[in-house]
Amino acid sequence: MIAFIVLLSLAAVLQQSSGTVDFASESSNKKDYRREIVDKHNALRRSVKPTARNMLQMKWNSRAAQNAKRSADRCTFAHSPEHTRTVGKFRCGENIFMSSQPFAWSGVVQDWYDEIKNVVDGIGAKPPGSVIGHYTQIVWYKSHLLGCASAKCSSTKYLYVCQYCPAGNISSSIATPYKSGPSCGDCPSACVNGLCTNPCEYEDTFSNCKALAKKTKCKTEWIKSKCPATCFCHNKII
């Protein structure tokens, strides 16, 4: 069977002073800034070009935020262990940003998204080897649970972390993080402002679950346990 391989990447360290803010005022513990973070992500997901027919709306998740806070508090410019990045049945992806000065959350998210300049739709990174993983995670179609946190590690070191569940950046699909087409084309009866609102509560273990399910009709317990999204999430984004 073919297991999913998740790719991770780290943001470059920023030294410039433009866009800096008071760190305490931007705490992700505050409801207003949680909304800012979610709205920024959804605005970027909604505005992708070409448009997406299967892009899910993101929502704040307190467990993902707790995990992100633990990751940020390590004050290490490295991804947290995979086993610490889970929410329920989902494995979660992670974006990390480090700066010498505090930044507004909207600026942090925009910096990740700006890797789009190195992306060619359907091809992937151009030139080859360019960092694009933060952008692709932000626009990964089925990542719909979001939690973020920050840490002041010293007077010249600030870490910002967001976790995304289920994880994006599956290596075999990195060039196509979403399905292009009319907005909400795959969710016409579950659409809010250009984003789908019908996520699947399960995650498949294997990348060839569609073929396995077609062959077995999802009649065996093994298939149901390994391919629950394909077997049970009809009329949902999987």
UniProtKB/Swiss-Prot annotation:
The keyword Disulfide bond applies. Residues 200-233 form the ShKT domain. Residues 38-164 form the SCP domain. The keyword Disulfide bond applies. It comes from the Eukaryota. Residues 1-19 form the signal peptide. Disulfide bonds join 75-153, 92-165, 148-162, 184-191, 187-196, 200-233, 209-227, 218-231. InterPro entries: Allrgn_V5/Tpx1_CS, CAP_dom, CAP_sf, Crisp-like_dom, CRISP-related, Cysteine_rich_secretory, SCP_CRISP, ShKT_dom. Keywords: Calcium channel impairing toxin, Disulfide bond, Ion channel impairing toxin, Neurotoxin, Secreted, Signal, Toxin. Expressed by the venom gland. Blocks contraction of smooth muscle elicited by high potassium-induced depolarization, but does not block caffeine-stimulated contraction. May target voltage-gated calcium channels on smooth muscle. PANTHER family: CYSTEINE-RICH SECRETORY PROTEIN-RELATED. Belongs to the CRISP family. This is Cysteine-rich venom protein 1. It comes from Hydrophis hardwickii.
